Amino acid sequence: MISDNARAGMQQAPARSLFNALGFTPEEMKKPMVGIVSSFNEIVPGHMNIDKIVEAVKLGVAEAGGVPVVFPAIAVCDGIAMGHVGMKYSLVTRDLIADSTECMAIAHQFDALVMVPNCDKNVPGLLMAAARLNLPTVFVSGGPMLAGHVKGRKRSLSSMFEAVGSYAAGTMTEDDVCEYENKVCPTCGSCSGMYTANSMNCLTEALGMGLRGNGTIPAVYSERIRLAKHAGMAVMDMYNKGIKARDIITKDAIMNALTVDMALGCSTNSMLHLPAIAHEIGFDFDISFANPISERTPNLCHLAPAGPTYMEDLNEAGGVWAVMKELADIGLLNTDCMTVTGKTVGENIKNAVNRDPEVIRPVDNPYSKTGGLAVLKGNLAPDGSVVKRSAVVDEMMVHEGPARVFDCEEDAIAAIKGGKIVEGDVVVIRYEGPKGGPGMREMLNPTSAIAGMGLGSSVALITDGRFSGASRGASIGHVSPEAAVGGPIALVEEGDIIKIDIPNMKLELDVSDEVLAERKAKWQPREPKVTTGYLKRYAALVTSGNRGAILALPGEQNA
């Protein structure tokens, strides 16, 4: 056992005295020590129930012959951090979570791990740690929130953000907004649509790192407690069989996850996190991989914000495995990949059933013949940009309009709510990238304001920042290279014509190469927005959005 390094032999007698202080018995010190990574806190609705999940995991581990030991991971609520300086501190926690989990696991010589995440950066951060540490590892999330109900219709947090925009447009009263405020988030859990947290929890299943239902069983269901017990048992089965994280997180598994991503219509943030997870196993994931997969993968689900269904509906329809069965039946998945069940993907999903063909469309009747995401390139984004095309209305799939340029999110929001943005405009928000932000803030407030003002079918938004999974419309993010390093987005001027062609994966600035060269010669880097603390170090180490905003030493950032 790895844990013998910390517990066995005369040399470790001092360590055993400390285990005695923890209450360990001699019998327990002879059993595998399983770290339970708990992201419980009392500030994130998706994490307030995780203490109960952790207790269930502990019972499962002990039942199967292991000794469970809990240690913490941090988690930020993106909804609470949204629209102010706090959003600079969201994406950056992903790497803190990965690094701190690595430190705890190796310092204390755990034999296996159960990760208990739920929200946006917590899930990919722990997936990165799992791949890096390569121990027997199982994931069990806290689960999604139930949808709210307003005036007889299901609603969620994205509805709340758009209600604020509608109030600014004069189409909602303060009482209307208050009703949304009190009803859209009725339970604990990760917000109820196919936003980033639920996207990543579903993709954890697709990767093979979570048991069936990990991404979809609602947080308040007792079924999730049973799932957590089974996760504890499963990690001991993996330990006994010698199955480790990198036996599961492989290149083929990551490509499976990307395929499922397209079918589900996941958050654009998956195009930051999958490259980062891939990096941990030495797989150079190019975001352009998304396009050929998207071209052959039908979009089968239109969960909020793309449509009127929610995670509870996907769960009732058969969940992620039912979606995977649809894809496997037409040869789009590698079904030989290993999973935490000790079985292959094919063995797991062979009896999965699609119980609701409106929530999960059959492959012969998809919402669209192409997947939910697209990577756009052109002279405005030479290294790529990302759009959730499953949430773009038909009339905005091809668009041309004048640039309305803003150097920060706040200025753009003021212009949108002030009525200064009109039909046909292309809002450009720059210097919000990984380095420029720093921290690559989500632009949910601007996109929600555009939708709430009634401009969602006529105005596009382009940024070197990123978007919440709750954003919809022609929202094109992760523009790379970013403005802070002199990318073409830094050279856009007010009124320049921008051409968007999502079907052909093009994003072009209608300005000649000669003019762009003249502008580039005059361009000067901006002074850093943050000069102290973690964000200063992060800005120095972070790479571009097209590389997953992974951290690298300065000499390796363009590798």
Swiss-Prot record:
InterPro entries: Dihydro-acid_dehy_C, DihydroxyA_deHydtase, DiOHA_6PGluconate_deHydtase_CS, ILV_EDD_C, ILV_EDD_N, IlvD/EDD_N. The active site is at 468 (proton acceptor). Binds 1 [2Fe-2S] cluster per subunit. This cluster acts as a Lewis acid cofactor. PROSITE patterns: ILVD_EDD_1, ILVD_EDD_2. Mg(2+) binds at residues 78, 120-121, 442. It is an enzyme of class 4 (lyase). It catalyses: (2R)-2,3-dihydroxy-3-methylbutanoate = 3-methyl-2-oxobutanoate + H2O; (2R,3R)-2,3-dihydroxy-3-methylpentanoate = (S)-3-methyl-2-oxopentanoate + H2O. Keywords: 2Fe-2S, Amino-acid biosynthesis, Branched-chain amino acid biosynthesis, Iron, Iron-sulfur, Lyase, Magnesium, Metal-binding. [2Fe-2S] cluster binds at residues 119, 191. Pathway: Amino-acid biosynthesis; L-isoleucine biosynthesis; L-isoleucine from 2-oxobutanoate: step 3/4; Amino-acid biosynthesis; L-valine biosynthesis; L-valine from pyruvate: step 3/4. Its cofactor is [2Fe-2S] cluster; Mg(2+). The modification N6-carboxylysine is found at residue 121. GO terms for cellular component: cytosol. Its EC number is 4.2.1.9. It holds the Pfam family ILV_EDD_C. GO terms for biological process: isoleucine biosynthetic process; L-valine biosynthetic process. Functions in the biosynthesis of branched-chain amino acids. Catalyzes the dehydration of (2R,3R)-2,3-dihydroxy-3-methylpentanoate (2,3-dihydroxy-3-methylvalerate) into 2-oxo-3-methylpentanoate (2-oxo-3-methylvalerate) and of (2R)-2,3-dihydroxy-3-methylbutanoate (2,3-dihydroxyisovalerate) into 2-oxo-3-methylbutanoate (2-oxoisovalerate), the penultimate precursor to L-isoleucine and L-valine, respectively. Belongs to the IlvD/Edd family. This is Dihydroxy-acid dehydratase. The lineage of its organism: Bacteria, Bacillati, Bacillota, Clostridia, Lachnospirales.
